[in-house]
Design a protein with these regions (language model features):
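Short beta->alpha junction loops
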Residues: 1-9
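Short beta-strand elements at the ligand-binding edges of bilobed clamshell
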Residues: 70-88
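Hydrophobic/aromatic beta-strand patches that form the interior of the parallel beta-sheet core
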Residues: 3, 31, 56, 81-83
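Short, well-structured alpha-helical segments in soluble
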Residues: 13-25
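Short, hinge-like loop/turn segments at secondary-structure boundaries
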Residues: 18-20, 49-50, 72-77
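A charged, well-structured terminal subsegment
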Residues: 84-102
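Short acidic active-site motifs
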Residues: 10-14, 40
Length: 102
């Protein structure tokens, strides 16, 4: 299943849905590119932590080679893994990695 939204509340709702699916054994985990919310959203991190969902935090670019404010992530502390800098190919790599974690 794939979702895209620029609305933080929708991302939180989908994380909560993922938690329900995980509890039912229907979900391996999430690959999340939260964009700028990575650096600002305690709410997204709390949602992941509260659901216990396995998370791979994904960034298309190498955020550590960008502006200093992008070097901090609220999600990294609740993510099983962090991937960055692979371009859009990172999505496939992250899904493969998620499958290997199970």
């Amino acid at each position: 299943r794939f979702h895209q939204s620029n609305r933080e509340y929708e991302l939180i709702d989908w994380i909560h849905e993922a938690g329900r699916l995980r509890a039912q054994g229907q979900l391996a985990g999430l690959v999340l590119n939260a964009g700028a919310y990575t650096h600002t959203s305690v709410a997204l991190a709390d949602a992941v932590k509260g659901t216990g969902v396995t998370l791979i935090e994904l960034h298309i670019s190498n955020v550590h080679a960008r502006e200093p404010f992008r070097h901090h992530s609220y999600l990294s502390a609740v993510a099983r893994a962090v991937m960055c800098g692979f371009g859009v190919a990172g999505y496939g790599l992250a899904i493969d990695a998620l499958a290997q974690m199970q």
